[in-house]
Amino acid sequence: MQELGAGVVNSHSGALAFGAMTKPSPVTLDGQSLSIADVVAVARHNVSVALDPQALKAVQQSRRAVEAAIERGETMYGVNTGFGKLAHVRIPAEQGRQLQLNLIRSHASGVGEPLPQDAVRAMMLLRANVLMRGTSGVRPVLPELLIEMLNRGLHPRVPSQGSVGASGDLAPLSHLALAMIGEGDVRVPKPITLEAKEGLAFVNGTQAQTGLAALLVSDAWTLWRTAHGAAAMSLEAVRGSPDPFDARIHDARPHPWQQRSAALLRELLADSEIRESHRDNDPRVQDAYSLRCTPQVLGAVGEGLAFAERLVATELNAATDNPLVFGDEVLSGGNFHGQPIALALDVVAIALTTLAGLGERRLERVVNPDLSSGLPAFLAREPGLESGFMIAQIAAAALVAECRVLATPASVQSVPTEGNQEDVVPMGMTAAWKAGRILANAERIIAIELLAGAQGLEYLKPLRPAKAVARLHAAVRQESAALTADRPLTADIERVTLRIREGRFAS
């Protein structure tokens, strides 16, 4: 499946469509080729999952290597030793199974509200895929059971808090493993008994934070595209100029995502009667930055999302447990450390906060009679008697403020744990929670902007906006009628927000 940041701007000259959806294909796990789009398909659309037969052979080979090392009497972390600060404690072979069982039971100590179902499904999928790399030393029955659970819709309750993301997401993955051994809150067809190394191989990894990151990156790209439609509609509503989106300007500063943003805006704003109505004799020389600099700002947002996508896409197929099996060797390392994903999530949070702030400023220009080039105050039919979008703009301002507070990076908030053995930790799950909250806020801000922009266009009739903007306006009107008198707007905002998440307005 195509990665999300690719092909954002149509390469053809056809019309932009809003809400086009493609049917996901079944996903086969081989530990090498899982994509973000695959994660979304399985996590949210219940696409079936299978295991690659050749990759299963590699899984079996790595298991034989672990068993051979045990027979040779080699000391292996987490196989015949304690964990973390207790790694110096040697564990007799006859207690190997109990060691793995104790690990799962003790580490299943997460707290807080449960993760949503799509996040749990993403985590399950990613954990199975990592095991399929053949470097974890587990039996094939582990990924096989995970896939059976996914395909049958068996999802354990996984608390959302309690992971610092250092030895991976120990608590969330332990709650998943608890179900697999028959001690969780969901019944599995055939609970397994964990053999040497298998408990550690299962819980040592970044799959909780990476699953959340994959879903967030997908949603962030959808919002990025939607924000361009909202920007185009706002520009039309206040009779702004598309001239600053001329390709020559952006080729002179060739940041790739700035160029793509400008190209998308040019396509959105082509053939506008509204533009032609004020092309000549307009006393305004230049629009405000929130209109004129949209490609520069959203282009930078796109660069941040592309960076995050690259890190997340790599992590989907990365071996993140410890120790790892390479041929006949079992090596200890630190691939479980979640810093790459925590950093990616912090970048997403900052990028989406920037997007949200820009959207709120455009919204202000549409509703403010001093800035809107002739639209009625707050888009009300009878300003004064009616308040129109006054409080909707205040709601957007409140959401922006919350985004800015939450944009403080989590990946620098290290708190040493486990007797100072884990002395540098990335806080990836905290970064994921913050980024998710910012995403939800930003979606609502763009929803309010879409509603206001659509209302603004009502006052410019019979002039017609650009064809793509007209289609977007019609799509918004399917969810929310024009404001003819004051009414509560909460339901309208939430409906449009839901459609944004579904990709209904993504150009």
Q: Which residues make up each language-model segment?
A:
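N-terminal amphipathic/basic-hydrophobic helices that include classical n-h-c signal peptides
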Residues: 1-20
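C-terminal auxiliary extensions adjacent to catalytic cores
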Residues: 21-47, 51-58, 62-70, 179-507
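Glycine-rich, flexible loop motifs
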Residues: 22-37, 43-73, 100-158, 217, ...
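Polyanion/phosphate-binding surface patch
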Residues: 74, 89, 261
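FAD-binding core of FAD-dependent oxidoreductases
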Residues: 77-91, 95-99, 106-129, 159-181, ...
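Catalytic or ion-translocation cores adjacent to nucleophile or general acid/base/metal-coordination motifs
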Residues: 93-108, 365-377
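Alpha-helix capping at helix-to-loop junctions
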Residues: 128-132, 148-155, 164, 182, ...
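Short, surface-exposed recognition loops or helix-turn segments adjacent to catalytic cores
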Residues: 157-167, 245-247, 326
